[in-house]
A protein has these predicted regions:
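Generic beta-strand structural signal
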Residues: 160-162, 358, 370
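Metal-dependent catalytic core segments for phosphate chemistry
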Residues: 361-386
Length: 389
């Protein structure tokens, strides 16, 4: 039987096993479907389908091909969540969208399509849209992709004027601009949409402050949006960690947040990192924008190199790594451990040591205990962000 919307269709595929997703994606769709059924929020099919039709009829590929985009079911469901879930006043529920997804799954195209829709058809006169990143060069990636996307469509390109620092749509007084970090000078912004590219690479306090500045500036808009889209990365204590902590707390039921929409495409079982079925959980576009053969080749390389494996886990599995260079296999370390308690070693001879960090290093406390000719090691790591010291 036909489904009333793409959210239900995607959820049906998940629950019947036709579509392979990880636990976090399953949880968000369980939350959404339950919320629609019990009246926590409403679904506006007209708004959702309007965005989908616009993207598929006006937004073009801009690398390797120039035909119109054709959204996959997972993308149609995501667009439906962003633009179709509303409150009783028909105002969109979600103001922060956090998408974690594997490399080569169309992140930039998706972000560019969202920019195009909100610039041309969202009905916000005087909209200000920012492509944000630590450096202008990175911010320009999504910005330039958006421009190339609309450049291929005459009906859109004739309305847009590319100026020195932005793209301007006179008809709606809308400006789209790339923006590098400068939290001190961001207080005057009034964004309708902020697209944060590869937030996993945003370092420490700078990224956190810039995100909060832009988030606090959303208040003057009726239906604003911050879209953060990224693969996993290597940076600690940044906005990626913050968004991940908020997202997982929300999905576990430990948070009362209502405006955050996390779509976390990640593998569940790290030991199955080289299993194609498991990899589908982090790569919903497998077989479309990225082929299974590509993954087989990358797996073959990663199986022979710990550093390549760390990169593969990070970029294709979305399992965050502390370093791009691994010197110990995490599986080997994990299997070497035993489930023992420190309390079981009372009155034993022990030697302890601590590592007191001064900058961004890990702080650790370890103790080695000898009993019966066997050495037992207990280690505890304390990772403290600079902002908390």
């Amino acid at each position: 039987m036909p489904f009333s919307n793409y959210i239900y269709e995607y959820y049906d595929g998940i629950t019947t096993g036709k579509i392979v997703v990880g636990k976090w994606v399953r949880l968000i769709y369980e939350y959404i479907v339950s919320g629609l059924q019990n009246g926590l929020f409403l679904f506006n099919a007209k708004k959702a389908n309007k965005a989908i039709r616009f993207i598929e009829n006006f937004c073009h590929h801009c690398e390797g091909r120039t035909d119109l985009l054709k959204l996959e079911l997972w993308q149609k469901a995501a667009v439906s969540l962003i633009f179709g879930i509303v409150d009783e006043d028909n105002v969109r529920i979600f103001r922060e969208v956090f998408i974690v997804i594997g490399r080569k799954n169309g992140k930039t195209l998706f972000a560019s399509a969202v920019i195009a829709y909100m610039a041309y058809l969202d009905g916000e006169y005087g909209a200000k849209i920012y492509c944000l990143a630590p450096k202008l060069e990175q911010a320009n990636i999504v910005y330039d992709n958006f421009f190339q996307m609309i450049k291929k469509e005459p009906e859109l390109s004739e309305l847009a004027k590319k100026r020195r620092s932005d793209i301007y749509i006179e008809e709606s007084n809308t400006a789209i601009k790339p923006l590098a970090f400068n939290a001190k000078k961001s207080d005057g912004f009034n964004p309708h949409l902020v697209v944060n590219d590869e937030v996993a690479s945003w370092r420490g306090d700078g990224g956190l402050k810039q995100y909060e500045v832009m988030k606090s500036a959303l208040g003057a808009r009726r239906q604003p949006l911050i879209l953060s889209i990224s693969t996993a990365g290597y940076e600690n204590d940044g906005i990626f960690d913050e968004l991940m902590a908020r997202s997982t707390a929300f999905l576990k039921g430990g948070s009362k947040e209502r405006r955050l929409l996390p779509l976390l495409y990640m593998i569940d079982d790290v030991e199955k990192w080289n299993d194609l079925e498991e990899l589908k959980k982090a790569n919903p576009n497998m077989g479309v924008s990225v082929s299974p053969e590509f993954f087989k080749e990358e797996i073959a390389v990663a199986e022979m190199s710990l550093s390549k494996r760390a990169e593969f886990l990070c970029k294709y599995c979305n399992i965050k790594q502390n370093s791009s260079v691994a010197w110990l296999d995490y599986v080997v370390v994990d299997r070497a451990g035993e489930k023992i308690k420190l309390e079981d070693f009372k009155d034993s001879y022990a030697v302890g040591g601590i590592d007191l960090s001064q900058t961004t290093d890990l702080t650790a406390a370890s103790v080695i205990i000898e009993r019966g000719g066997v050495l037992y090691a207990f280690t505890q790591f304390f990772k403290i962000g600079r902002a908390h010291v």
